[in-house]
Each structure stands twice: as C-alpha cells, then as structure tokens.
Amino acid sequence: SNHIKILEYFNYFSNKDINQLSNLFDDDITLVDWNISATNKNNVIQANKDIFNSVQTINVEIVNISEKEKTFFCQLIITINGSEKIDVVDIIEFNNVGKIKSIKAYKG
C-alpha cells in the first residue's frame, strides 16, 4: 500500500539509501523544499545525494501521518547530526501505479 511506502520512504531517507529511494520515485517526480526545487528522477536523486553529503546523519521521526486518496500529509521531526532538530511537514503524492510523483517539504 502507499501507506507502507511512506514509512519505507522515511526509513530509506534516514538511512541515506539512494537506490531504494529511487525505486519509489516516478520518472517525472518533483521535489520542492525551502532550499531546492528539482524535477525528474535523476535531478531529485541528485538533490537527495546533496542533502545526504551535507550531513553526517539525518533521522526522520514521524509525528503524524494523514492521507486523502493518493496524498499524504506527514508531520515530522528531522534530526541532523544527532542534535539539530527541524519541524517539517511533507506533502507526498503518489501516481496511479504507486510511485511518488511529488514531494513538497515545508519547514516549521
């Protein structure tokens, strides 16, 4: 289910697992956060690599997940390098075949 894929996504992100993340992404995925905007799978993967290379560790704690059809609203606490905590809301949309087509991240 897409709900399980959301949990996998945050696990793979916390583990900096580019290959597994790539498997979840649609070819035409878009990613927008407070620093970057990327379109298509290769560019989104590169954006993730850049994030992972800029930190020693990154850990995603899920506070709450709500869903409406193929869209998930995820309240998160992201801990960088074991100490810096950021409140984030991700809005993640899936396509009809269960691939992530859009990620929008908002910093709280």
Predicted regions and their residues:
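Short, surface-exposed coil-to-beta transition loops
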Residues: 58-60, 84-90
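Short beta-strand edge/turn micro-motifs at domain boundaries
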Residues: 87-108
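Short acidic/polar mixed-charge low-complexity motifs
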Residues: 37, 82-86, 99
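Short beta-strand segments that buttress and anchor functional surface loops
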Residues: 73-81
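A solvent-exposed, acidic/Ser-Thr-rich amphipathic alpha-helical stretch
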Residues: 18-19, 26-68
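Short, low-complexity N-terminal intrinsically disordered segments enriched in polar/charged residues
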Residues: 1-19, 23
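Hydrophobic pocket/interface hotspot
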Residues: 9, 20-22, 29, 44, ...
